[in-house]
Amino acid sequence: MREYDDIIYRNQWISVEEVNKGWSEDKKFHIKTKDNKNLLLRICDVSQYEKKKKEFEIIKELNKKSFNMSIAIDYGVCNGGKSVYSLYSWIDGDDAREKLNNLSKEKQYNLGIISGKYLKEIHGIPAPNHIENWEERFNKKIDRKIDNYKKCGMILENDDKIINYLEKNRELLKNRPQCFQHGDYHIGNMIITYDNELGIIDFNRFDYGDPWEEFNRIVWSAEISPEFSSGYINGYFDNNVPDEFFKLMLLYISSNQISTVAWAKSFGEKEIEVAINQTREIIKWYDYYRSYIPNWYMEDMKS
């Protein structure tokens, strides 16, 4: 018996095709039903039940908002009690990483604006009251990441500049608000539909924290489309971006990058090379930390 065969909807499905894209630990399947619907099935170990229940409930809450994303259908236990499944509607379209550069720069920018507005809506869900103070929480994360980097045996060029920025800008973490976070918000988790509209996918890394921390993943978008990434920032802030945002974005990007080689070691030489090259590029964006605004950022499309 396959792990999804005891799901109550199984007899309505005419095809089940595994999807191998992305870094998620979930198994993902594209399902076609007898009544010509496309669905996304996610399966993981039953030990993740409470997390998947919470993810499903949050997506149901987000479904009330105005942006394009998968609709939550059902979740439950399958595979003889060994797994938990989540069933969602499927968003038809292309991976934004592959499609963006086929669009005009203006369209890329406009889709970026939409992505920023979507993220602002996502951040409308508040964090639980009992959550740890952000300054304390993130300072621990910085300490842990620097420590892991120093122990990993790999050396990033200009690592002193990265660590120095982190150490000198910890005060930016004071009094930061917290909210629901998508957890991995970048073009790798976005779909461009066949009508050239934007869809958001893969909420499985959701968390709670400073809303601006979400921009730590912007590097994956900026590498492919500076126009999209500029629009993303401007759309989020409705074209009124505070100076402090750029300083904090660099703090969060720096925190990510100092730990990226230690993370990449688990995945082999190819990922290590990606991490090293990406960090080298980011340092150039910021003129070797002489600027806290990346060189690709445009206040508008005329810049």
Predicted features along the sequence, with ranges:
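ATP-binding pocket architecture of kinase catalytic cores
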Residues: 17-133
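Generic structural signal for small/hydrophobic residues in well-ordered secondary structure
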Residues: 28, 41, 72, 89, ...
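An alpha-helical support segment within catalytic cores of ATP-dependent transferases
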Residues: 1-11, 113, 121-183, 234, ...
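Active-site acidic catalytic loop and adjacent metal/ATP-binding pocket
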Residues: 27-32, 164-215
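Short, flexible helix/strand-to-coil boundary loops that buttress conserved ligand/catalytic motifs
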Residues: 63, 73, 100, 204, ...
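Helix-rich C-terminal or lid/interface subdomains of diverse kinases
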Residues: 113, 174, 217, 224-303
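Conserved strand-to-helix beginnings and helix N-cap segments that scaffold or border functional pockets
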Residues: 52-55, 212, 230
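Glycine-rich, phosphate-binding/catalytic loops in enzymes
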Residues: 59, 104-105, 199, 216-218, ...
